[in-house]
Amino acid sequence: MELDEIISEVKKHITEKRYVHTEGVAFTAAALAMKFSYESGYRENDNMEFVDKARTAGYLHDNAKCLSDEELLAVCAKNNIPVTECEKKSPYLLHGKVGAFYAKTLYGIDDEDILNAITYHTTGRPGMSMLEKIIFTADYIEPGRTRQANLDYIRYLA
């Protein structure tokens, strides 16, 4: 599925407030990808590929955020998605895993880096790829965020 189609589909399935956040994450992710594409192994002529991956992950990162805790757990159970004890206690953390599952099954995303960026955008993990770090950071610093601790300083560092 092309990015324009993904954007259109995502917009149909999330709230307006969530969509504004999603656009902010995609925009911020694209800007960070432009800044860090060279460090990620992309060269001048193909850095737009990395920017497109960042935009795609940004638009899809919260595609399962609208599901209730019960729905997230049910999707995981039905599709054999592993759930940790921590996730059982705080099922909202599963929106990354379920979002990656939906990205693959509903939106046709097969790029492991994009899928991992969606999976770990809330929790992070050791050894994150540059794209994973970008989505994790973009979710925190996107323009619509106003109340995160040390936000101006973190934006400056990014």
Label every PLM stretch briefly.
Residues 8-14, 38, 47-158:
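Divalent metal-dependent catalytic cores for phosphoryl transfer on phosphate-bearing substrates
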